[in-house]
Curated annotation (Swiss-Prot):
Pfam families: Corona_NS1. InterPro entries: Corona_NS1 (IPR009314). Belongs to the coronaviruses ns4.9 protein family. Changing residue 19 to S: In strain: Isolate BCQ.3994. Changing residue 43 to F: In strain: Isolate BCQ.571, Isolate BCQ.1523, Isolate BCQ.2590 and Isolate BCQ.7373. This is Non-structural protein of 4.9 kDa.
Amino acid sequence: MTTKFVFDLLAPDDILHPFNHVKLIIRPIEVEHIIIATTMPAV
Protein backbone atom coordinates (compact mmCIF):
# COMPACT_ATOMS: atom_id res chain seq x y z
CA MET A 1 0.00 0.00 0.00
CA THR A 2 1.46 3.31 -1.09
CA THR A 3 1.22 6.66 0.62
CA LYS A 4 -0.37 8.16 -2.49
CA PHE A 5 -3.09 5.52 -2.41
CA VAL A 6 -3.85 6.33 1.22
CA PHE A 7 -3.91 10.04 0.39
CA ASP A 8 -6.31 9.36 -2.48
CA LEU A 9 -8.60 7.56 -0.04
CA LEU A 10 -8.53 10.48 2.38
CA ALA A 11 -8.75 13.16 -0.32
CA PRO A 12 -9.99 11.63 -3.57
CA ASP A 13 -8.99 13.44 -6.76
CA ASP A 14 -11.64 11.70 -8.86
CA ILE A 15 -12.89 15.00 -10.26
CA LEU A 16 -9.47 16.00 -11.57
CA HIS A 17 -8.23 12.51 -12.37
CA PRO A 18 -8.49 11.67 -16.09
CA PHE A 19 -9.30 8.06 -15.24
CA ASN A 20 -11.83 8.85 -12.54
CA HIS A 21 -14.35 6.38 -13.95
CA VAL A 22 -11.72 3.64 -13.74
CA LYS A 23 -10.76 4.59 -10.20
CA LEU A 24 -14.38 4.50 -9.09
CA ILE A 25 -14.45 0.86 -10.17
CA ILE A 26 -11.01 -0.12 -8.89
CA ARG A 27 -11.00 1.73 -5.56
CA PRO A 28 -13.75 -0.35 -3.88
CA ILE A 29 -11.86 -3.51 -4.85
CA GLU A 30 -8.61 -2.14 -3.42
CA VAL A 31 -10.39 -1.02 -0.26
CA GLU A 32 -11.79 -4.51 0.16
CA HIS A 33 -8.29 -5.95 -0.22
CA ILE A 34 -7.01 -3.53 2.43
CA ILE A 35 -9.80 -4.52 4.80
CA ILE A 36 -8.98 -8.19 4.27
CA ALA A 37 -5.25 -7.54 4.67
CA THR A 38 -5.73 -5.58 7.89
CA THR A 39 -8.24 -7.95 9.47
CA MET A 40 -6.59 -11.24 8.55
CA PRO A 41 -3.56 -12.36 10.59
CA ALA A 42 -0.23 -11.92 8.85
CA VAL A 43 0.92 -15.13 7.21
